Amino acid sequence: MKSQITNALSDFFFEYETPRQVLVRNRRVGVVCRLIQLGVLAYIIGWVFIYEKGYQSSDTAVSSVFSKMKGVGYTNVTGTERIWDVADYVFPPQGDSSFVVMTNYIITEGQKMGNCPELPGKHNCSSDADCEGGSFKRTGHGQMTGKCVNTTKTCEVLAWCPVEDDNNIPDPPLLMSAENYTLFIKNSVTFPLFEVTRSNLVEGIDNNYISKCLYDQEDSPLCPIFKLGDIVKMSGFNFETIAKVGGAIGIVIDWTCNLDFNVKHCKPMYNFHGLYGNPDEKDKARASVGYNFRFAKHYMEDKVQQRTLLKVFGIRIDIIVQSLARKFDIIPTLTAIGSGVGIFGVATVVCDLVLLYLLPKREFYKNMKFKYTDTQTQVKHSL
């Protein structure tokens, strides 16, 4: 028993096993083998290394976005002239990555709390029995008092009076001048894995350049100042259409960087996408077209609280940062090479199947490839 254990350990540590190889001179099998190996080699070089960059590690960025609108708008509604600046038409005003630029509005001035009739169509009535006191209607403006107003044939409500009438949207939009507003975007990204920080104000963009440039896909692709009309156009929308009822546009800042080269070549690319807003062009959600919201400015007059209500139609802009940085790394490189070497074994498996099961001389090849032993014969010899 001791000698058997010793022999087993000796065989394990001091012997090397290698598979038996048979050289088959067959043109068909040889061509199939080389074609498969060539295909695997093309896959490793073309797909894994060139297209998928299998020799590099990757990282996504931590980013921040700051935005600033500039421009002045002018309206003249029923003889009332007004100038609109940034504080009036941008919501919210903090310079976030998502904001709304007002392009059209419906204004209801001098509202105060009281009893007044609903709009026709909101809750029609023929008698007080049709107006249940203390109840609400989802599309109404307030709480019903239980009275039917004979002059309008609608229920009386406790609400901010006079109630808003938003059935007629101004056309053309009141703030068509918004087409000339400009948007300044400041974006900073950091790739933690590679300890690289970049800004869209890349080399060559200084105060003098910013004061004169305007983004153009061909002539000034790195300028961080955009004309609102150009943004709408590049997103595939018509400005007058989207300005009337509002809509949404996505500005994508794409940081795709190969850090094997100098970091100064890591620069942003801007893409513009129309999300919704033009019913005749892209928007399929016909039940709720455009983008709008309401806000009120409250004030006191003769010790009575009043408000001016604005239904705002605007262009919502969402600035989205997408990023991917790559850099050479020995670990994924060795992993990709090892996987490729393993895939080469497919050629051997396929060729063995052809040799052993498809060719006319398959029995001959089986005898050459496999060595058969007879256990009973070995037992007799040992005895």
Which ranges hold each PLM region?
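Membrane-proximal N-terminal segments immediately preceding the first transmembrane helix
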Residues: K2-V24, V312-S323
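Long, solvent-exposed, non-transmembrane segments immediately flanking or lying between transmembrane helices
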Residues: L38, A42-H273
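Membrane-proximal extracellular juxtamembrane segment immediately upstream
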Residues: K267-L383
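Beta-strand-rich binding-surface signature
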Residues: Q21, V32, V252, M269, ...
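Solvent-exposed, extramembrane regions of membrane proteins
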Residues: M1-F13, E17, T78, R82, ...
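Eukaryotic intrinsically disordered and solvent-exposed regulatory patches
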Residues: V31, F239-T241, E301-V304
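Beta-strand elements of modular eukaryotic interaction domains
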Residues: F12, I242-V245, Q306-R307
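Alpha-helical transmembrane segments
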Residues: Y16-D59, A325-L359
